[in-house]
Swiss-Prot record:
Pathway linked to the protein: Pyrimidine metabolism; UMP biosynthesis via de novo pathway; UMP from orotate: step 2/2
Keyword RNA-binding in record: no
UniProt name for this protein: Orotidine 5'-phosphate decarboxylase
Organism: Bradyrhizobium sp. (strain BTAi1 / ATCC BAA-1182)
Keywords for this protein: Decarboxylase, Lyase, Pyrimidine biosynthesis
Gene that encodes it: pyrF
Pfam families found in the cross-reference section: OMPdecase
Protein role: Catalyzes the decarboxylation of orotidine 5'-monophosphate (OMP) to uridine 5'-monophosphate (UMP).
Binding residues for substrate: 16, 38, 65-74, 120, 181, 190, 210-211
Active site: K67 (proton donor)
Xref: NCBIfam families: PRK00230.1, pyrF
Amino acid sequence: MPTEIAPRDRLIVALDLPGVAEAEAMITRLGDAVTFYKIGMELTYAGGLGLAERLAADGKQVFMDLKLHDIPNTVERATRQIARLGARFLTVHGFSQSMTAALAGAAGSPLELLAVTVMTSYDDADLAAAGYAMGVKELVARRAVQAKQIGIHGLILSPEETQLVRPLVGPDMQLVTPGIRPAGSDVGDQKRIMTPALAIAGGADRLVVGRPVTGAADPAAAAESIVADIASALALVGKTNRT
């Protein structure tokens, strides 16, 4: 039976920083305010794999945002290596071969896979320029259904698409949303964004937040404010929670 996700565990702070020293300094500043961290490509290539392993050993949850997409054998073996770090989540692009291979690599481990539907920096015009005949919402829906059929654990998608996707995939797939900006924050390079409270109310399970926390004068206070927004939204909607 599913158990409750605490509001604090729903916030994933993106360590989009240039090096391990900067990331470790930020983790120290955040202290107990944050339990879940995302490590992306930039930090991974700067020594982030070791950091991920240390975070997991310290009891933090780790999301490796590597968006794997390669020949199946490479994806499977790379996923197996990530699983050995103790990470909780790993992203893979929402193509059937990559998703199937990643599942094989994660077999027998606690690692959960999140399929990337459409990058939150893309809009319909970007897809058209890349040769897609469908818009963002149609492509997100198609990839979400395929990911569920393959057995992927969750999805990465814009908060705008959570209400579209939830009826298609049911209650058990975790919906993890980047593009989260507290009211008044700079939108940066995201095109499909939403506030934390609205994202939770719309059906998101976990929220990825980077610069509004790591770029704040007081990162721990910024994180606590977002956690409070999440808790308030959960109370308002009476959300059924899952691990």
